[in-house]
Swiss-Prot record:
It comes from the Bacteria. The gene is sodC. Cu cation binds at H67, H69, H92, H147. Its cofactor is Cu cation; Zn(2+). The lineage of its organism: Bacteria, Pseudomonadati, Pseudomonadota, Gammaproteobacteria, Enterobacterales. This is Superoxide dismutase [Cu-Zn]. It comes from Escherichia coli (strain K12). It holds the Pfam family Sod_Cu.
Amino acid sequence: MKRFSLAILALVVATGAQAASEKVEMNLVTSQGVGQSIGSVTITETDKGLEFSPDLKALPPGEHGFHIHAKGSCQPATKDGKASAAESAGGHLDPQNTGKHEGPEGAGHLGDLPALVVNNDGKATDAVIAPRLKSLDEIKDKALMVHVGGDNMSDQPKPLGGGGERYACGVIK
């Protein structure tokens, strides 16, 4: 009986030790709406911060801006009088209202993530860590966004890292 109890205890401890994670389905976005799936990003709680593990395809090669946006929607909305892809996601997650884009380790937007790197085959599989984000609860019901082009993690010379249009989006549930 003692061995059985120890086995049950070990199973409970091992099961409880699993890190919380969430798989986010990612879709292409345009000013007309949400398009085809390009894969997923699994977000896992780690002792170093939230880890974002992409399994994405059909992306332009190179670096891309990668952010958490304030609202959990990938639908288009009107900005400056014209329809804009995934505009309903709002801006970068910034609960402290810093108004600054300083990258994942800076004191600005909490939604600033390390750049997403896409290989020459259009695939992104390299995980990145967001050290300031510790819990999935912080980003629940927000949007995960891939922007066209790189991100210099600054508001200079262009705002929001100089990244381009919103290219792919998924809602973190």
